[in-house]
């Protein structure tokens, strides 16, 4: 074997070793690239999922806040219209106090209360419009004092001086009690009910 052949053989062997090493290095580089790529994809997928979850939570929170705000707005609007009904009823009291049934009811309450006082002094408060009706029932009874109250819309309020108790038969109080007990029904009539 001559020198050239030996050199060729040697070169071929070195070439094969270099080629093998390059192939191994290339495979290792591809493996590292694939691992890095997979790791980056996993990392960013996790970040994207976290952002999606956070955004969903924010959207749900905003949705809940808006629902509460809408309910509050509806309640305010309902209350406004219920109060409008109440105001209309108050306006109608002027018509009620002119009826015979109203005057008969005042007389009946007063007659019953005066019979039960047995000498105790009482003060009867009434609206200026009801004073003549109250005076008719009281007559000359010395135990009864009549006072007008401009704030009263109708009805009477009786103060028992001996016991310090007051019995309130004023139309405003009765109306308030009836209205409060019927608030749900009024709401159902106005806005559709259950």
UniProtKB/Swiss-Prot annotation:
One of its GO terms (biological process) is proton motive force-driven plasma membrane ATP synthesis. It is found in: Cell membrane. One of its GO terms (molecular function) is proton-transporting ATPase activity, rotational mechanism. Keywords: ATP synthesis, Cell membrane, Hydrogen ion transport, Ion transport, Membrane, Transport. Its main location: membrane. Gene3D superfamilies: ATP synthase, E subunit, C-terminal (3.30.2320.30). Pfam families: vATP-synt_E. HAMAP family: ATP_synth_E_arch (MF_00311). Has multiple subunits with at least A(3), B(3), C, D, E, F, H, I and proteolipid K(x). Component of the A-type ATP synthase that produces ATP from ADP in the presence of a proton gradient across the membrane. This is A-type ATP synthase subunit E. It comes from Saccharolobus islandicus (strain Y.N.15.51 / Yellowstone #2). The lineage of its organism: Archaea, Thermoproteota, Thermoprotei, Sulfolobales, Sulfolobaceae.
